[in-house]
Amino acid sequence: MPSVKIKENEPFDVALRRFKRSCEKAGILSEVRRREFYEKPTSERKRKLAAAVKRHAKKVQREQRRFERLY
């Protein structure tokens, strides 16, 4: 759980912004959204596999564009 020490004479808005940023870095909101509803193990595997395929296709496309620029 992220915690923020409020410095002396620090405005509340600044401390809140730092807290939000630390929560975002820790991935708390994405974790809450992911756990909001139960996901069957097969659905989770399917989603992760689809994400991996998408990442791989994006990586291959990026490499293809890089090689096109060289020639």
From Swiss-Prot:
It comes from the Bacteria. One of its GO terms (biological process) is translation. PROSITE patterns: RIBOSOMAL_S21. Transmembrane segments: none annotated. GO terms for cellular component: ribonucleoprotein complex; ribosome. Signal peptide: none annotated. Keywords: Ribonucleoprotein, Ribosomal protein. Belongs to the bacterial ribosomal protein bS21 family. NCBIfam families: S21p (TIGR00030). This is Small ribosomal subunit protein bS21. It comes from Hahella chejuensis (strain KCTC 2396).
